[in-house]
UniProtKB/Swiss-Prot annotation:
Family matches, as Gene3D superfamilies: Ribosomal protein L14 (2.40.150.20)
Name of the molecule in the record: Large ribosomal subunit protein uL14
Keyword entries, A-Z: Ribonucleoprotein, Ribosomal protein, RNA-binding, rRNA-binding
CDD domains hit by this protein: Ribosomal_uL14
Pfam families in alphabetical order: Ribosomal_L14
Oligomeric form and interacting partners: Part of the 50S ribosomal subunit. Forms a cluster with proteins L3 and L19. In the 70S ribosome, L14 and L19 interact and together make contacts with the 16S rRNA in bridges B5 and B8.
Role this protein plays: Binds to 23S rRNA. Forms part of two intersubunit bridges in the 70S ribosome.
SMART domains attached to this UniProt entry: Ribosomal_L14
Entry GO CC: cytosolic large ribosomal subunit
Amino acid sequence: MIQMQTNLDVADNSGARRVMCIKVLGGSKRKYAGVGDIIVVSVKEAIPRGRVKKGDVMKAVVVRTAKDVKRADGSVIRFDKNAAVLINNQKEPVGTRIFGPVPRELRARNHMKIISLAPEVL
């Protein structure tokens, strides 16, 4: 469950290291985002010579949450930290590599490019 002011790690090589959620997209009263949801983030920490700079406002897809993700078969999956992948306006990743595992739920949300770049799909 990601809400406003939540800090997330960045799971790609776009140059950002840490971002903060400033808006959950998908309705005016929507409070929380889960795996596969799109949020608006502000870059809080970035590496030098990266594609993005500190202070940039971008969209991101949530790829890992510490809150359980319940599946249809009754199993749950959870991660140690919250993480996101930065995307552009065409919903394509800004980076060229994805770090760490991503859940299968991204496939149902049509984030196929992230699925194909990920080293492991759980």
